[in-house]
Amino acid sequence: MTHPPPFIAVIPARLASTRLPNKPLADLGGKPMVVRVAERAREAGAQQVLVASDAQSVLDAARDHGFEAVLTRADHPSGTDRLAEVAAAFGWRDDTVVVNVQGDEPLIDPVLVRDVASHLAAHPACAIATAAHPIHDAADVFNPNVVKVALDAQSVALYFSRAPIPWSRDAYQPHWPDVAAMPPPAFPVYRHIGLYAYRARFLRTYPSLAQAPIEQAEQLEQLRALWHGERIAVLITESAPEAGIDTPADLARVQALFQPGSK
């Protein structure tokens, strides 16, 4: 078995969620959600797992289950900003691989976490690695809530967008506006998976990077890195990961999976 390169997993966990308050502490089979996520990160082989939160109750929950936790500011606009604070505080070496494991994804595949970390380690010219999978439903291609990524020949990101990219002129133009009901074009359209591995060097510089106009227009923070000349390596997987928890309905669905006897 090939061992993955060393990496650190940081789980940003914000208590004040608009759609689902106290989400990190939601009970999943007798453990808080944030602990379930931390367990997945540990299964992925992270040499260090850190829960980063602005809420003492979240830190206490993590520590009660044996995980390291660090208090961060409450005014971070994104999880990446929270990671940047942690990277600055711990003083990790520039080439340290740090994976942002979302605190609301208790079903995330540990293999995917490990593979994204390994993908960044294998691409020294890139500051970030992430993942994507082929889209097989044209409705998803045209859904602005499904973020797409266009790649170069080395599977490095050219652009991320809520729009359908790449645009297949010959496939779509004659059939507009009924294209969302069509099969997707023969060439792959990739859906971005919101899992990131960063070099610590990039995280420390991130807060000083000005917001990009394309970032503000698309409301996609990864575009800030591209705007400022950083490279993002993209790992291609065959299928979508399990969805995260954003709503009470999502929570009920996942809680059912953690009930005794559930498969």
Curated annotation (Swiss-Prot):
Pathway: Nucleotide-sugar biosynthesis; CMP-3-deoxy-D-manno-octulosonate biosynthesis; CMP-3-deoxy-D-manno-octulosonate from 3-deoxy-D-manno-octulosonate and CTP: step 1/1; Bacterial outer membrane biogenesis; lipopolysaccharide biosynthesis. Disulfide bonds: none annotated. Keywords: Cytoplasm, Lipopolysaccharide biosynthesis, Nucleotidyltransferase, Transferase. SUPFAM superfamilies: Nucleotide-diphospho-sugar transferases (SSF53448). GO terms for biological process: CMP-keto-3-deoxy-D-manno-octulosonic acid biosynthetic process; lipopolysaccharide biosynthetic process. One of its GO terms (cellular component) is cytosol. Its EC number is 2.7.7.38. PANTHER family: 3-DEOXY-MANNO-OCTULOSONATE CYTIDYLYLTRANSFERASE, 3-DEOXY-MANNO-OCTULOSONATE CYTIDYLYLTRANSFERASE, MITOCHONDRIAL. Activates KDO (a required 8-carbon sugar) for incorporation into bacterial lipopolysaccharide in Gram-negative bacteria. This is 3-deoxy-manno-octulosonate cytidylyltransferase. It comes from Burkholderia orbicola (strain MC0-3).
